[in-house]
């Protein structure tokens, strides 16, 4: 699974002031694997926050064999949308569209050299220089949450694959299984 689309969801939803950095209430996913290496080729997953004061959902997908759409990220809100063009790992602009009787659009563009990874390297260098063990921009909580989400998606899929193998090998034709939700 790719991490870049996850980053946008965390910035928009996990860090949203109304969420107060609460973990998602539900994670679901689907994956197609390559026949050659059995690694994920296409993965889609949904991360849902369903809290009394904050409800939001991220629908994410990544692929190693299909090109990204021109608009890599669309974040819809009640009063507008933020659109981030491809490539998702190195966007050089974003567009804010406000909904209303006359839709307003604001475009912000940035110029920099490289593929975008230097931002992470610069942050690591700043942390090392300052003696920090954790970045204030992307703390351990976000990395651990990412691992939990990815584990949940892959665990759910491996349980499903195992259940399918049992069905194929079953002589009684009946299977009762409980999948963790």
Question: What are the residue ranges of the model-derived segments?
Answer:
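Contiguous beta-strand/loop segments that form the cofactor/metal-binding neighborhood of enzyme cores
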Residues: 2-90, 124-127, 151, 169-179
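C-terminal helix-rich "cap/oligomerization" subdomain common to oxidoreductases
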Residues: 50, 123-181
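Generic anion/oxyanion-binding catalytic loop in active/binding sites
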Residues: 34, 113, 132
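Soluble or luminal CAZymes and related metallo-dependent hydrolases
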Residues: 2, 116, 142
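Active-site oxyanion/phosphate-handling segment shared across diverse enzymes
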Residues: 86-89, 95-99, 117
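Surface-exposed loop/edge segments in extracytoplasmic proteins
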Residues: 102-106
């Amino acid at each position: 699974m790719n991490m870049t689309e996850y980053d946008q969801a965390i910035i928009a939803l996990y860090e949203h002031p109304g969420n107060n950095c609460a973990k998602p209430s539900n994670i679901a996913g689907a994956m197609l694997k390559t026949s050659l290496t059995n690694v994920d080729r296409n993965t889609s997953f949904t991360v849902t926050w369903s809290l009394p004061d904050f409800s939001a959902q991220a629908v994410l997908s990544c692929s190693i064999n299909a090109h990204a759409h021109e608009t890599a990220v669309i974040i819809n809100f009640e009063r507008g949308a933020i659109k981030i063009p491809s490539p998702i790992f190195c966007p050089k602009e974003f567009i804010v569209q406000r909904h209303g009787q006359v839709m307003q659009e604001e475009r912000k563009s940035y110029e920099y050299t490289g593929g975008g990874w230097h931002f992470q390297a610069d942050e690591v260098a700043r942390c090392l220089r300052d003696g920090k063990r954790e970045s204030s921009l992307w703390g351990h909580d976000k990395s651990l949450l990412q691992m939990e989400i990815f584990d949940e998606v892959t665990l759910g899929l491996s349980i499903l694959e195992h259940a399918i193998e049992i069905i194929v090998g079953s002589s009684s034709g009946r299977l009762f299984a409980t999948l963790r939700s």
